[in-house]
From Swiss-Prot:
One GO CC term on file: chloroplast
Family under the similarity heading: Belongs to the intron maturase 2 family. MatK subfamily.
Subcellular localization: Plastid, Chloroplast
Name under which the protein is recorded: Maturase K
Principal location class: plastid
Gene Ontology terms, MF aspect: RNA binding
Domain of life according to the entry: Eukaryota
Name of the gene encoding the protein in the UniProt record: matK
Protein backbone atom coordinates (compact mmCIF):
# COMPACT_ATOMS: atom_id res chain seq x y z
CA UNK A 1 0.00 0.00 0.00
CA UNK A 2 2.94 2.37 0.62
CA UNK A 3 4.14 1.79 -2.94
CA UNK A 4 0.63 2.49 -4.24
CA UNK A 5 0.52 5.79 -2.37
CA UNK A 6 3.83 6.77 -3.90
CA UNK A 7 2.67 5.87 -7.37
CA UNK A 8 -0.56 7.81 -7.17
CA UNK A 9 0.64 10.87 -5.24
CA UNK A 10 -2.51 10.33 -3.26
CA UNK A 11 -2.48 13.69 -1.47
CA UNK A 12 -2.96 15.60 -4.69
CA UNK A 13 -5.60 13.28 -6.07
CA UNK A 14 -7.47 13.18 -2.77
CA UNK A 15 -7.54 16.96 -2.62
CA UNK A 16 -9.00 17.46 -6.10
CA UNK A 17 -10.94 14.18 -6.27
CA UNK A 18 -9.73 13.59 -9.82
CA UNK A 19 -9.26 9.99 -10.89
CA UNK A 20 -9.46 10.12 -14.67
CA UNK A 21 -5.86 11.47 -15.17
CA UNK A 22 -4.64 8.12 -13.86
CA UNK A 23 -5.77 6.55 -17.14
CA UNK A 24 -2.75 8.24 -18.73
CA UNK A 25 -0.28 6.50 -16.40
CA UNK A 26 1.43 3.28 -17.46
CA UNK A 27 1.62 1.77 -13.97
CA UNK A 28 -2.18 1.64 -13.73
CA UNK A 29 -2.29 -0.95 -16.51
CA UNK A 30 0.57 -2.80 -14.88
CA UNK A 31 -1.42 -2.90 -11.64
CA UNK A 32 -4.38 -4.32 -13.55
CA UNK A 33 -2.25 -7.38 -14.31
CA UNK A 34 -0.28 -7.48 -11.07
CA UNK A 35 -0.67 -10.68 -9.07
CA UNK A 36 0.32 -8.87 -5.89
CA UNK A 37 -2.97 -6.99 -5.69
CA UNK A 38 -4.93 -10.27 -5.49
CA UNK A 39 -7.75 -8.83 -7.55
CA UNK A 40 -9.25 -6.29 -5.16
CA UNK A 41 -9.19 -5.51 -1.47
CA UNK A 42 -12.95 -5.10 -1.52
CA UNK A 43 -13.92 -8.01 -3.73
CA UNK A 44 -13.30 -11.71 -3.99
CA UNK A 45 -9.92 -13.02 -5.28
CA UNK A 46 -9.44 -12.82 -9.00
CA UNK A 47 -8.12 -15.46 -11.34
CA UNK A 48 -4.53 -15.13 -12.43
CA UNK A 49 -3.99 -13.07 -15.53
CA UNK A 50 -1.61 -14.33 -18.19
CA UNK A 51 1.24 -12.04 -19.17
CA UNK A 52 0.88 -12.45 -22.92
CA UNK A 53 1.73 -10.08 -25.73
CA UNK A 54 -1.57 -8.25 -25.25
CA UNK A 55 -0.41 -6.75 -21.97
CA UNK A 56 3.02 -5.71 -23.17
CA UNK A 57 4.35 -2.28 -22.38
CA UNK A 58 4.45 -1.39 -26.09
CA UNK A 59 0.69 -1.77 -26.45
CA UNK A 60 0.11 0.25 -23.29
CA UNK A 61 2.31 3.08 -24.58
CA UNK A 62 0.43 3.09 -27.88
CA UNK A 63 -2.83 3.19 -25.96
CA UNK A 64 -1.75 6.18 -23.86
CA UNK A 65 -0.51 8.00 -26.96
CA UNK A 66 -3.85 7.44 -28.63
CA UNK A 67 -5.72 8.63 -25.54
CA UNK A 68 -3.84 11.95 -25.70
CA UNK A 69 -5.32 12.52 -29.15
CA UNK A 70 -8.51 14.48 -29.55
CA UNK A 71 -11.82 12.57 -29.77
CA UNK A 72 -10.06 9.24 -29.33
CA UNK A 73 -13.14 7.63 -27.81
CA UNK A 74 -15.35 8.69 -30.71
CA UNK A 75 -12.85 7.32 -33.21
CA UNK A 76 -12.62 3.99 -31.41
CA UNK A 77 -16.39 3.64 -31.28
CA UNK A 78 -16.94 4.47 -34.95
CA UNK A 79 -14.31 2.02 -36.09
CA UNK A 80 -15.96 -0.28 -38.63
CA UNK A 81 -13.95 -3.29 -37.48
CA UNK A 82 -15.31 -3.05 -33.94
CA UNK A 83 -18.57 -4.46 -32.65
CA UNK A 84 -18.62 -2.61 -29.34
CA UNK A 85 -16.55 -0.74 -26.84
CA UNK A 86 -16.62 -3.11 -23.90
CA UNK A 87 -15.91 -6.78 -23.54
CA UNK A 88 -14.67 -7.79 -27.01
CA UNK A 89 -11.19 -9.12 -27.75
CA UNK A 90 -11.19 -7.41 -31.17
CA UNK A 91 -11.13 -4.02 -29.48
CA UNK A 92 -7.93 -4.36 -27.52
CA UNK A 93 -7.54 -0.70 -26.59
CA UNK A 94 -11.03 -0.35 -25.15
CA UNK A 95 -10.55 -3.56 -23.18
CA UNK A 96 -7.36 -2.19 -21.66
CA UNK A 97 -9.10 1.09 -20.78
CA UNK A 98 -11.90 -0.73 -18.98
CA UNK A 99 -9.38 -2.85 -17.05
CA UNK A 100 -7.41 0.22 -16.03
CA UNK A 101 -10.60 2.01 -15.06
CA UNK A 102 -11.54 -0.91 -12.82
CA UNK A 103 -8.30 -0.40 -10.89
CA UNK A 104 -8.78 3.35 -10.63
CA UNK A 105 -12.28 3.31 -9.14
CA UNK A 106 -11.10 0.93 -6.43
CA UNK A 107 -8.33 3.24 -5.24
CA UNK A 108 -10.34 5.54 -2.91
CA UNK A 109 -12.12 2.62 -1.26
CA UNK A 110 -8.98 0.54 -0.89
CA UNK A 111 -7.00 3.34 0.72
CA UNK A 112 -9.83 4.39 3.04
CA UNK A 113 -10.37 0.80 4.10
CA UNK A 114 -6.69 0.26 4.90
CA UNK A 115 -6.49 3.55 6.82
CA UNK A 116 -9.64 2.68 8.76
CA UNK A 117 -8.27 -0.74 9.70
CA UNK A 118 -5.02 0.83 10.87
CA UNK A 119 -6.81 3.46 12.95
CA UNK A 120 -9.05 0.88 14.61
CA UNK A 121 -6.04 -1.47 15.02
CA UNK A 122 -7.92 -4.36 13.45
CA UNK A 123 -5.55 -7.21 12.68
CA UNK A 124 -5.73 -8.80 9.26
CA UNK A 125 -6.98 -12.33 9.48
CA UNK A 126 -7.50 -14.66 6.54
CA UNK A 127 -9.81 -16.79 8.68
CA UNK A 128 -12.39 -14.02 8.72
CA UNK A 129 -12.61 -14.31 4.94
CA UNK A 130 -13.63 -17.95 5.10
CA UNK A 131 -17.24 -18.62 4.17
CA UNK A 132 -17.18 -21.59 6.54
CA UNK A 133 -16.94 -19.14 9.44
CA UNK A 134 -20.65 -18.48 8.86
CA UNK A 135 -21.67 -21.94 10.07
CA UNK A 136 -20.12 -21.71 13.58
CA UNK A 137 -22.05 -18.47 13.83
CA UNK A 138 -25.21 -20.37 12.85
CA UNK A 139 -24.50 -23.03 15.46
CA UNK A 140 -24.19 -20.42 18.16
CA UNK A 141 -27.15 -18.20 17.22
CA UNK A 142 -29.84 -20.05 15.27
CA UNK A 143 -30.73 -22.49 18.03
CA UNK A 144 -32.12 -19.52 20.02
CA UNK A 145 -34.14 -18.03 17.14
CA UNK A 146 -37.59 -18.78 15.77
CA UNK A 147 -37.87 -17.61 12.18
CA UNK A 148 -35.62 -17.44 9.15
CA UNK A 149 -36.08 -15.51 5.92
CA UNK A 150 -34.34 -16.37 2.65
CA UNK A 151 -33.67 -13.24 0.60
CA UNK A 152 -32.51 -12.98 -3.01
CA UNK A 153 -31.07 -9.52 -3.69
CA UNK A 154 -32.42 -8.26 -7.04
CA UNK A 155 -30.16 -7.33 -9.93
CA UNK A 156 -30.06 -3.72 -11.18
CA UNK A 157 -32.35 -3.43 -14.19
CA UNK A 158 -30.54 -0.43 -15.69
CA UNK A 159 -26.86 0.61 -15.72
CA UNK A 160 -27.74 4.14 -14.60
CA UNK A 161 -28.59 2.73 -11.17
CA UNK A 162 -24.98 1.62 -10.74
CA UNK A 163 -23.70 5.05 -11.77
CA UNK A 164 -26.03 6.82 -9.34
CA UNK A 165 -24.79 4.55 -6.57
CA UNK A 166 -21.16 5.53 -7.13
CA UNK A 167 -21.97 9.24 -7.38
CA UNK A 168 -22.20 9.41 -3.60
CA UNK A 169 -18.70 7.96 -3.21
CA UNK A 170 -16.76 9.30 -6.19
CA UNK A 171 -16.79 13.07 -6.71
CA UNK A 172 -14.99 12.87 -10.04
CA UNK A 173 -17.58 13.65 -12.74
CA UNK A 174 -15.40 12.66 -15.76
CA UNK A 175 -14.79 9.22 -14.28
CA UNK A 176 -18.51 8.73 -13.73
CA UNK A 177 -19.21 9.80 -17.32
CA UNK A 178 -16.66 7.27 -18.54
CA UNK A 179 -18.29 4.55 -16.45
CA UNK A 180 -21.69 5.55 -17.81
CA UNK A 181 -20.27 5.34 -21.33
CA UNK A 182 -18.92 1.82 -20.71
CA UNK A 183 -22.17 0.50 -19.29
CA UNK A 184 -24.56 2.13 -21.74
CA UNK A 185 -22.49 1.10 -24.75
CA UNK A 186 -22.47 -2.48 -23.57
CA UNK A 187 -26.14 -2.57 -22.56
CA UNK A 188 -27.25 -1.04 -25.88
CA UNK A 189 -25.22 -3.52 -27.91
CA UNK A 190 -26.80 -6.41 -25.98
CA UNK A 191 -30.37 -5.13 -25.69
CA UNK A 192 -31.83 -8.36 -27.06
CA UNK A 193 -30.09 -10.48 -24.43
CA UNK A 194 -31.89 -11.22 -21.18
CA UNK A 195 -30.75 -9.44 -18.04
CA UNK A 196 -29.27 -12.53 -16.39
CA UNK A 197 -27.29 -13.56 -19.49
CA UNK A 198 -26.16 -9.99 -20.07
CA UNK A 199 -24.79 -9.64 -16.54
CA UNK A 200 -23.15 -13.06 -16.74
CA UNK A 201 -21.38 -12.18 -19.99
CA UNK A 202 -20.26 -8.79 -18.70
CA UNK A 203 -18.86 -10.41 -15.54
CA UNK A 204 -16.65 -12.61 -17.72
CA UNK A 205 -15.57 -9.76 -19.99
CA UNK A 206 -14.33 -7.54 -17.15
CA UNK A 207 -14.59 -9.50 -13.93
CA UNK A 208 -12.79 -6.96 -11.79
CA UNK A 209 -15.05 -4.05 -12.72
CA UNK A 210 -18.15 -6.20 -12.46
CA UNK A 211 -17.28 -7.38 -8.94
CA UNK A 212 -16.68 -3.82 -7.81
CA UNK A 213 -19.99 -2.57 -9.24
CA UNK A 214 -21.90 -5.57 -7.94
CA UNK A 215 -20.43 -5.25 -4.44
CA UNK A 216 -21.35 -1.57 -4.31
CA UNK A 217 -24.89 -2.39 -5.47
CA UNK A 218 -25.29 -5.15 -2.89
CA UNK A 219 -24.00 -2.92 -0.12
CA UNK A 220 -26.56 -0.28 -1.05
CA UNK A 221 -29.33 -2.88 -0.95
CA UNK A 222 -28.37 -4.10 2.51
CA UNK A 223 -27.32 -0.74 3.97
CA UNK A 224 -30.78 -0.39 5.49
CA UNK A 225 -29.85 -3.14 7.97
CA UNK A 226 -26.80 -1.19 9.15
CA UNK A 227 -28.77 2.00 9.60
CA UNK A 228 -31.76 0.50 11.41
CA UNK A 229 -29.48 -1.64 13.56
CA UNK A 230 -27.58 1.39 14.80
CA UNK A 231 -30.75 3.39 15.33
CA UNK A 232 -32.64 0.69 17.21
CA UNK A 233 -29.88 -0.90 19.28
CA UNK A 234 -27.98 0.52 22.22
CA UNK A 235 -25.07 -1.86 21.55
CA UNK A 236 -23.09 -0.63 18.58
CA UNK A 237 -21.95 -3.26 16.12
CA UNK A 238 -18.23 -3.64 15.49
CA UNK A 239 -16.64 -2.63 12.23
CA UNK A 240 -16.61 -5.56 9.83
CA UNK A 241 -14.59 -4.00 7.03
CA UNK A 242 -16.71 -5.40 4.19
CA UNK A 243 -17.53 -1.90 2.94
CA UNK A 244 -17.06 1.57 4.35
CA UNK A 245 -20.10 3.00 6.07
CA UNK A 246 -21.74 5.94 4.35
CA UNK A 247 -22.67 9.00 6.35
CA UNK A 248 -25.01 10.37 3.69
CA UNK A 249 -27.34 7.40 4.10
CA UNK A 250 -29.55 9.58 6.28
CA UNK A 251 -30.75 11.26 3.11
CA UNK A 252 -32.63 8.11 2.19
CA UNK A 253 -34.94 8.51 5.19
CA UNK A 254 -37.32 10.56 3.05
CA UNK A 255 -38.28 7.45 1.08
CA UNK A 256 -38.64 5.42 4.25
CA UNK A 257 -40.89 8.06 5.78
CA UNK A 258 -43.23 7.93 2.79
CA UNK A 259 -43.38 4.16 2.91
CA UNK A 260 -43.52 3.53 6.63
CA UNK A 261 -45.37 6.53 7.99
CA UNK A 262 -45.26 10.23 8.65
CA UNK A 263 -42.95 10.03 11.65
CA UNK A 264 -39.86 7.86 11.21
CA UNK A 265 -39.01 7.72 14.91
CA UNK A 266 -42.49 6.43 15.73
CA UNK A 267 -42.31 3.68 13.14
CA UNK A 268 -38.74 2.71 13.95
CA UNK A 269 -39.73 0.81 17.09
CA UNK A 270 -41.67 -1.65 14.93
CA UNK A 271 -38.36 -3.02 13.65
CA UNK A 272 -36.52 -3.19 16.96
CA UNK A 273 -35.29 -6.72 17.47
CA UNK A 274 -32.14 -7.33 19.55
CA UNK A 275 -32.04 -10.96 18.37
CA UNK A 276 -31.97 -10.30 14.64
CA UNK A 277 -29.01 -11.65 12.64
CA UNK A 278 -28.10 -11.16 9.00
CA UNK A 279 -25.57 -13.02 6.83
CA UNK A 280 -24.97 -12.91 3.09
CA UNK A 281 -22.95 -14.66 0.41
CA UNK A 282 -23.06 -13.12 -3.07
CA UNK A 283 -26.70 -12.37 -3.92
CA UNK A 284 -28.32 -14.67 -1.36
CA UNK A 285 -28.81 -13.66 2.26
CA UNK A 286 -30.35 -15.04 5.44
CA UNK A 287 -32.29 -12.94 7.94
CA UNK A 288 -33.02 -14.77 11.21
CA UNK A 289 -35.00 -13.40 14.12
CA UNK A 290 -36.46 -14.36 17.46
CA UNK A 291 -39.49 -12.17 16.86
CA UNK A 292 -42.99 -13.01 15.73
CA UNK A 293 -44.14 -13.80 12.17
CA UNK A 294 -45.78 -10.37 12.12
CA UNK A 295 -42.38 -8.71 12.63
CA UNK A 296 -40.80 -10.79 9.86
CA UNK A 297 -43.59 -9.80 7.46
CA UNK A 298 -42.95 -6.15 8.30
CA UNK A 299 -39.30 -6.62 7.40
CA UNK A 300 -40.31 -8.27 4.14
CA UNK A 301 -42.59 -5.44 3.03
CA UNK A 302 -40.08 -2.87 4.25
CA UNK A 303 -37.30 -4.33 2.08
CA UNK A 304 -39.53 -4.58 -0.98
CA UNK A 305 -40.64 -0.95 -0.61
CA UNK A 306 -37.12 0.26 0.13
CA UNK A 307 -35.68 -1.39 -2.98
CA UNK A 308 -38.55 -0.12 -5.10
CA UNK A 309 -38.34 3.49 -3.88
CA UNK A 310 -34.59 3.91 -3.80
CA UNK A 311 -33.34 1.60 -6.57
CA UNK A 312 -36.49 1.39 -8.68
CA UNK A 313 -36.19 -2.38 -8.39
CA UNK A 314 -39.23 -4.58 -8.43
CA UNK A 315 -38.55 -7.46 -6.08
CA UNK A 316 -41.05 -10.28 -6.51
CA UNK A 317 -42.64 -11.49 -3.27
CA UNK A 318 -41.40 -15.01 -3.95
CA UNK A 319 -37.79 -13.79 -3.64
CA UNK A 320 -38.26 -13.46 0.14
CA UNK A 321 -39.40 -16.58 2.00
CA UNK A 322 -40.28 -16.60 5.70
CA UNK A 323 -40.32 -19.92 7.56
CA UNK A 324 -40.10 -21.30 11.06
CA UNK A 325 -36.77 -22.80 12.00
CA UNK A 326 -38.29 -25.69 13.93
CA UNK A 327 -40.00 -27.22 10.88
CA UNK A 328 -38.11 -25.83 7.91
CA UNK A 329 -34.69 -26.38 6.34
CA UNK A 330 -32.98 -23.63 4.37
CA UNK A 331 -30.35 -24.04 1.68
CA UNK A 332 -27.21 -21.93 2.01
CA UNK A 333 -23.65 -22.37 0.70
CA UNK A 334 -24.21 -25.94 -0.46
CA UNK A 335 -25.64 -27.13 2.86
CA UNK A 336 -29.20 -27.92 3.89
CA UNK A 337 -29.37 -26.41 7.39
CA UNK A 338 -32.07 -26.79 10.02
CA UNK A 339 -32.67 -26.61 13.77
CA UNK A 340 -33.76 -29.99 15.15
CA UNK A 341 -35.44 -30.68 18.48
CA UNK A 342 -33.65 -33.51 20.27
CA UNK A 343 -35.57 -34.81 23.27
CA UNK A 344 -33.80 -36.44 26.19
CA UNK A 345 -35.18 -38.04 29.34
CA UNK A 346 -33.41 -37.20 32.60
CA UNK A 347 -34.10 -39.15 35.79
CA UNK A 348 -33.84 -37.11 38.98
CA UNK A 349 -34.12 -38.59 42.46
CA UNK A 350 -34.72 -36.67 45.67
CA UNK A 351 -34.68 -38.83 48.80
CA UNK A 352 -37.34 -41.48 48.21
CA UNK A 353 -39.00 -39.77 45.26
CA UNK A 354 -37.76 -39.96 41.68
CA UNK A 355 -38.79 -37.88 38.70
CA UNK A 356 -38.51 -38.34 34.94
CA UNK A 357 -38.06 -35.08 33.07
CA UNK A 358 -38.37 -34.90 29.29
CA UNK A 359 -36.33 -31.99 27.94
CA UNK A 360 -36.08 -30.76 24.35
CA UNK A 361 -32.76 -29.36 23.16
CA UNK A 362 -32.42 -27.40 19.93
CA UNK A 363 -29.46 -28.44 17.83
CA UNK A 364 -28.20 -26.97 14.58
CA UNK A 365 -27.86 -29.60 11.85
CA UNK A 366 -26.19 -29.38 8.45
CA UNK A 367 -26.52 -32.08 5.81
CA UNK A 368 -25.42 -32.43 2.22
CA UNK A 369 -28.34 -32.37 -0.26
CA UNK A 370 -27.67 -35.52 -2.23
CA UNK A 371 -30.07 -34.94 -5.14
CA UNK A 372 -28.69 -31.51 -6.20
CA UNK A 373 -25.14 -32.79 -5.73
CA UNK A 374 -25.81 -35.78 -7.99
CA UNK A 375 -27.26 -33.32 -10.49
CA UNK A 376 -23.99 -31.37 -10.43
CA UNK A 377 -22.00 -34.58 -10.94
CA UNK A 378 -24.27 -35.53 -13.84
CA UNK A 379 -23.75 -32.11 -15.40
CA UNK A 380 -19.98 -32.63 -15.07
CA UNK A 381 -20.30 -36.07 -16.78
CA UNK A 382 -19.33 -38.16 -13.74
CA UNK A 383 -22.68 -39.99 -13.63
CA UNK A 384 -26.14 -39.91 -15.14
CA UNK A 385 -29.15 -38.18 -13.62
CA UNK A 386 -29.94 -41.33 -11.61
CA UNK A 387 -26.51 -41.34 -9.95
CA UNK A 388 -25.11 -44.25 -11.96
CA UNK A 389 -21.36 -43.70 -12.50
CA UNK A 390 -20.16 -43.32 -16.09
CA UNK A 391 -16.76 -42.90 -17.68
CA UNK A 392 -15.46 -39.35 -17.77
CA UNK A 393 -14.11 -38.19 -21.16
CA UNK A 394 -10.43 -37.23 -20.85
CA UNK A 395 -7.65 -36.59 -23.28
CA UNK A 396 -6.00 -39.77 -24.48
CA UNK A 397 -2.50 -38.42 -23.78
CA UNK A 398 -3.10 -38.29 -20.01
CA UNK A 399 -1.38 -40.98 -17.97
CA UNK A 400 -3.13 -43.19 -15.43
CA UNK A 401 -1.53 -41.33 -12.52
CA UNK A 402 -2.72 -37.97 -13.86
CA UNK A 403 -6.30 -39.25 -14.20
CA UNK A 404 -6.15 -40.72 -10.70
CA UNK A 405 -4.81 -37.46 -9.30
CA UNK A 406 -7.57 -35.45 -10.95
CA UNK A 407 -10.34 -37.68 -9.63
CA UNK A 408 -8.72 -37.80 -6.21
CA UNK A 409 -8.33 -34.03 -6.10
CA UNK A 410 -12.00 -33.52 -6.99
CA UNK A 411 -13.06 -35.97 -4.30
CA UNK A 412 -10.80 -34.42 -1.66
CA UNK A 413 -11.92 -30.88 -2.45
CA UNK A 414 -15.57 -31.88 -2.26
CA UNK A 415 -15.05 -33.76 1.00
CA UNK A 416 -13.03 -30.87 2.38
CA UNK A 417 -15.83 -28.43 1.60
CA UNK A 418 -18.57 -30.67 3.06
CA UNK A 419 -16.57 -31.62 6.15
CA UNK A 420 -19.13 -29.81 8.31
CA UNK A 421 -21.97 -32.16 7.40
CA UNK A 422 -23.77 -33.77 10.34
CA UNK A 423 -24.35 -36.94 8.33
CA UNK A 424 -21.62 -38.31 6.13
CA UNK A 425 -23.70 -40.97 4.35
CA UNK A 426 -24.29 -38.64 1.40
CA UNK A 427 -20.57 -38.03 1.05
CA UNK A 428 -19.89 -41.77 1.06
CA UNK A 429 -22.23 -42.15 -1.90
CA UNK A 430 -20.52 -39.28 -3.73
CA UNK A 431 -17.12 -40.89 -3.12
CA UNK A 432 -18.45 -44.16 -4.48
CA UNK A 433 -19.68 -42.41 -7.64
CA UNK A 434 -16.34 -40.68 -8.20
CA UNK A 435 -14.33 -43.80 -7.46
CA UNK A 436 -16.36 -45.98 -9.83
CA UNK A 437 -16.36 -43.24 -12.47
CA UNK A 438 -12.57 -43.15 -12.23
CA UNK A 439 -12.41 -46.93 -12.61
CA UNK A 440 -14.72 -46.83 -15.64
CA UNK A 441 -12.62 -44.07 -17.20
CA UNK A 442 -9.37 -46.00 -16.79
CA UNK A 443 -10.88 -49.32 -17.88
CA UNK A 444 -12.26 -47.64 -20.99
CA UNK A 445 -8.84 -46.22 -21.73
CA UNK A 446 -7.19 -49.65 -21.44
CA UNK A 447 -10.16 -51.44 -23.08
CA UNK A 448 -10.68 -53.63 -20.03
CA UNK A 449 -13.51 -54.43 -17.62
CA UNK A 450 -14.11 -52.48 -14.44
CA UNK A 451 -13.85 -55.57 -12.24
CA UNK A 452 -10.49 -56.56 -13.71
CA UNK A 453 -9.16 -53.05 -13.40
CA UNK A 454 -10.27 -52.69 -9.76
CA UNK A 455 -8.68 -56.03 -8.97
CA UNK A 456 -5.42 -54.89 -10.52
CA UNK A 457 -5.33 -51.49 -8.77
CA UNK A 458 -6.76 -52.56 -5.42
CA UNK A 459 -5.61 -50.43 -2.49
CA UNK A 460 -3.96 -47.81 -4.71
CA UNK A 461 -7.34 -46.56 -5.87
CA UNK A 462 -8.67 -46.55 -2.30
CA UNK A 463 -5.70 -44.57 -0.97
CA UNK A 464 -6.16 -41.94 -3.66
CA UNK A 465 -9.71 -41.28 -2.48
CA UNK A 466 -8.89 -41.39 1.25
CA UNK A 467 -9.28 -37.79 2.33
CA UNK A 468 -7.16 -35.95 4.86
CA UNK A 469 -10.24 -35.39 7.03
CA UNK A 470 -10.66 -39.12 7.57
CA UNK A 471 -7.01 -39.49 8.50
CA UNK A 472 -7.19 -36.57 10.95
CA UNK A 473 -10.40 -37.82 12.56
CA UNK A 474 -8.90 -41.24 13.11
CA UNK A 475 -6.03 -39.63 15.04
CA UNK A 476 -8.03 -37.08 17.04
CA UNK A 477 -11.10 -39.01 18.12
CA UNK A 478 -10.71 -42.30 19.98
CA UNK A 479 -12.24 -45.42 18.52
CA UNK A 480 -14.87 -46.28 21.09
CA UNK A 481 -18.24 -48.00 20.62
CA UNK A 482 -20.05 -44.73 21.34
CA UNK A 483 -17.95 -42.77 18.86
CA UNK A 484 -19.62 -42.14 15.52
CA UNK A 485 -17.14 -40.60 13.08
CA UNK A 486 -19.86 -39.82 10.55
CA UNK A 487 -21.39 -37.34 13.04
CA UNK A 488 -18.28 -35.25 13.63
CA UNK A 489 -18.27 -31.82 11.99
CA UNK A 490 -15.17 -29.83 11.14
CA UNK A 491 -15.27 -26.33 9.68
CA UNK A 492 -12.14 -25.33 7.78
CA UNK A 493 -11.33 -21.63 7.73
CA UNK A 494 -9.25 -21.77 4.56
CA UNK A 495 -12.27 -21.94 2.24
CA UNK A 496 -13.04 -18.56 0.69
CA UNK A 497 -15.44 -19.56 -2.10
CA UNK A 498 -18.10 -22.16 -2.68
CA UNK A 499 -17.15 -25.40 -4.40
CA UNK A 500 -18.25 -25.54 -8.04
CA UNK A 501 -19.97 -28.91 -7.62
CA UNK A 502 -21.65 -27.73 -4.41
CA UNK A 503 -23.07 -24.63 -6.07
CA UNK A 504 -26.53 -25.72 -7.22
CA UNK A 505 -27.92 -22.25 -7.96
Amino acid sequence: MEELQGYLEIDGFRQHHFLYPLLLQEYIYALAHDHGLNGSILSEPMENFSHDNKSSSLIVKRLITRMHQQNHLIISVNDSNQKGFVGHNKNLYSQRISEGFAVIVEIPFSLQLVFSLEEKEIAKSHNSRSIHSIFPFFEDKLSHLNHVSNILIPYPIHPEILVQTLRCWIQDAPSLHLLRFFLHEYWNSNSLITLKKSISFFSKANQRLFLFLYNSHVYECESVFIFLRKQSSHLRSTFSGSFLERTHFYGKIEHLVVVLGNDFQKTLWLFKDPFMHYVRYQGKSILASRGTPFLMKKWKYHLVNFWQCHFYLWSQPDRIHINQLCNHSFYFLGYLSSVQLNSSVVRSQMLENSFLMDTAIKKFETIVPIIPLIGSLAKAKFCNVSGHPISKPFRTDLSDSEILNRFGRICKNLSHYHSGSSKKQSLYRIKFILRLSCARTLSRKHKSTVRAFLKRLGSELLEEFLTEEEQVLSLIFPRTPSHRPHRERIWYLDIICINDLANHE
